[in-house]
């Protein structure tokens, strides 16, 4: 003990940073030297699931834990809190608890704040000081309520915003919050039912990465996206009713990851500039693929389709025809998990007459990978036959059999 206590305080603080916050605080009883060291930790994490070791489900244990945070968090002395994470699973906070802890973090120029409320959504981010925090760079909320005050707000440094299972005070809360973030670069929204939103408006000129996940039960109103600087777009949409995406021009978009059950092709008009496209959609259709003729993906280099049904090759073959510079094609076959959906394979023209070969087969396709190949499926065999017969530039091939 004497040897480690002889180390400089700065080094001891770095050592304490490797410990859970509650354990680091407990070292304050070791000696006078250790009494205040934990107060200079740059990162703090309070999580009742990890920290409550006795009587996890008891009201008294959670009350003791609340008191522990209320006592120790205000004692923190570092001028900047690099990150503060608050996670609650087994008890109910009072509104003033979370509000006071957030205000302490803001007063210490917090840079990253995470609030995770498992199983409950009665914790409101209503502290007015939070919405004017100049130091905040990252804000993450899970299962909380966003209550934006009517006063003038600004988050001038916020670059990352993650909102999962969040409930909003009203229809304007999210729009107002986004309008306070002039330099926001990454936005992730995961929607579930009862979030008090109908449509969704994302109007953030500075945004570079956008991730939208919508589950069954969410409203089916339109999504409006105005993000001219966007580089990456993810849309996972499992809503039961048909909805549309209205997207302003995104000329800098380079990568898209799409999993939409209905009309995913409607988005293709926005993807003319992308280099990487991942598609997890229902390919099964006896009709012609539904995106507009004349759309060409001149910059697309990597294509990853996830296959659920028969007749997947119809849309894929058209995408290949419209992607003259494609270098990497990786097919992930998950049909075995969707046997109830699989329809009858209807051979398309290329399986009968291979005279029309995609340009990328002749000039650019270098890598071809298949995960879970079904040798008993005629459609799979037809497509592989086409690839190996005409893809002249292949350098790498990988096929995993189911």
Swiss-Prot record:
- Domain FBD stretches: 349-401
Q: Name one Pfam family in it.
A: F-box
Question: Domain F-box spans what residues?
Answer: 1-47
Under InterPro entries, the record lists: F-box-like_dom_sf (IPR036047), F-box_AtFBL13-like (IPR053781), F-box_dom (IPR001810), FBD (IPR006566), FBL13/AtMIF1-like (IPR050232), LRR_dom_sf (IPR032675), LRR_FXL15/At3g58940/PEG3-like (IPR055411)
Q: What is this protein called?
A: Putative FBD-associated F-box protein At5g56690
